[in-house]
Amino acid sequence: MNRIGKQALFVLATVLLGVVTITIVAQTAKPKRINQAIELLTEGQPIYYTGSHSGTTGTYEQGVKDAQTYADYISYDMEHAPFDVKGLQEYMRGLAAGGPDRSGHRTPAVIVNVPVNGMDAAAVHANAWMFNQVLATGVHGVMLTHADDPGAIRAFVEAVRFPIHHEGVGVDGLPEGRRGVHGVATAAQIWGVSQEEYEEKADPWPLNPNGELLLGVKEEDKYALANVDENLKVPGIGMAEWGPGDMAMSLGVRAQGAAAVQDPKMVAARAKVLAACKANHIFFLNSFSAKDVVDMIKEGVMVGPASPETAAIGRKYTNRPPPF
């Protein structure tokens, strides 16, 4: 064999060794929870997600591929992308078939942006069927968009909870859950648990310390901003974002990108949402980049979209132990 051939063989062997190593680590890792995003947050580790507002390809094949993502969770957009529950169901089946993921979890966590605007409780109640259908596919969390009003957020938490759970009921007017039992069988299959175990675990964390659902709200317009202190007091919410794109439009800021974020009105809006998150022990979501991820973490950002490079920098800074 000539020199070039030997070099090619060495490269191939190195790649195969890496694949085998990842597989062995995933198989030997023993996750503490079903939802890796929650597991990491309980350990004080920031979490990094992948996904875009253009949507995720809702197919079994894409799910198999994404099962080995670098990210801590997958943001699956159905707010602006089509509301295709069948596609989401096939995607979740693919994730389960392609797992375990790199951290040893059965699947990466999936959190869905559902096209329900939280303008008021009536709007959320009228569209609660969307949460039922999405959760039945076995996802691990849901984001409520334009969460403007505390009544809307209470209705959101109500819609995703089974009535067998009572943590927080009556606190700040939180009602009993209204989620129905049908759909449990399909979700339990994705999680790899019995139907009874799914019913016990499919509850919002950290309201329920043993819950495996991560709920988030988007405080992304001037109406939400006016109510943000009360909004984030509602029990059951785990994370919140300030949605700079929609916030800029709502505040009349016509600049784009960094120029918009640096506008004084935007700086004040972000600071208000961050302060409300800290006051209510809710994790703040903000975009990360390779240049600012360390500073963001120091500021208190615990959730955000990130490239593989950015996630690697953040994980190194916080001394996150492998596998990931």
Language-model region placement:
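Expand to "…catalyze enediolate/carbanion chemistry for C-C bond making/breaking, isomerization
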Residues: 24-324
